[in-house]
Amino acid sequence: MPISSALAERIATSPKAELHIHIEGSLEPELMFALAERNGVKLPYASVEEVRAAYAFDDLQSFLDLYYAGASVLLTEQDFYDMTAAYVARALADNVHHAEIFFDPQTHTARNVPMHVVIHGIVRALDDAEREHGFSSALILCFLRHLSEEDAFDTLEAALPYIQDPANRIIGVGLDSSERGNPPEKFARVFARCKELGLRLVAHAGEEGPAQYVIDALDILKVERIDHGVRAIDDAALVKRLAAERIALTVCPLSNEKLKVYPDLRDHSLKQLLDAGCAVTLHSDDPAYFGGYMNTNWLATFNALDLSAADAHALARNSFEASFLPEQDKALWLAKVDDHWKAAH
């Protein structure tokens, strides 16, 4: 049953933090085409409509193939700036006030785009967003799990000068790309090194991979937050642990539906995980490819799972609690979230 228009409006206007957003996954077809033209890159599509048609993929690998083709248009600092500024505009429209944004340097350095071009373009847009709109943000450098751990170490080494300068906003590392056949332990040493460096640790686990990958990400990689994690529902002991330790799951329902993790949103495990006391949060993942930014994800999920105002309040609170914001900033946002929701349930 669709939720009430009053609840839909309160969800849309609620303060939120976005903790699972790949900046390259926010590249809309129109901007992809504009950048291809600007840079003289030939795309395998004749029109924006053809790109949209290619978005009819139904598994992670087909999506990744398209994602990497799209990234080929990103060549200059201005390209990364434009892509990031476009994401921020959409986030602000959805009342996202803080974002912890993934970026994939290996996708770009493999194409001979220098690390500084990627980082400076993204950071310049985030600096402008903070100055002009008060938009708070941080960056999480992701290693591509289909590549080797040695490649991840090389990437970390190349990124270190940027990581060590707080102006670049890089607070942590993550692990993304093809989960099947690339278990967390493949990256145990590089994550141990990142922990030594004082970086925050997160990893994609339990999306297409099994619940065991969530356990391994926690126990081998020592991550603080699990990206996706929806397959945890298959292991009752793990669900209890996630709830007891308040380990956040950054869940992306439209992504899960599009990639057939859950072919029908009505079957999604989000509500079960939330009811079990897990620190579930709700995000957009790769919104240009999966059909929606934050509010679209929230509203689709609430309609499919018949969630309540109390659920919305919990999800909004969880998004700030699970963030890597300083405690005093978290407290300010949690008070704003509580004010927003106190009259609704």
UniProtKB/Swiss-Prot annotation:
It catalyses: adenine + H2O + H(+) = hypoxanthine + NH4(+). GO terms for molecular function: adenine deaminase activity; zinc ion binding. Binds 1 zinc ion per subunit. InterPro entries: A_deaminase_dom (IPR001365), ADE (IPR028892), Ado/ade_deaminase (IPR006330), Metal_Hydrolase (IPR032466). The keyword tRNA processing does not apply. This is Adenine deaminase. The record marks H228 as: Important for catalytic activity. Substrate binds at D286. Catalyzes the hydrolytic deamination of adenine to hypoxanthine. Plays an important role in the purine salvage pathway and in nitrogen catabolism. Zn(2+) binds at H20, H22, H204, D285. It is an enzyme of class 3 (hydrolase). Belongs to the metallo-dependent hydrolases superfamily. Adenosine and AMP deaminases family. Adenine deaminase type 2 subfamily. Its cofactor is Zn(2+). Keywords: Hydrolase, Metal-binding, Nucleotide metabolism, Zinc. GO terms for biological process: adenine catabolic process; hypoxanthine salvage; nucleotide metabolic process. Its EC number is 3.5.4.2.
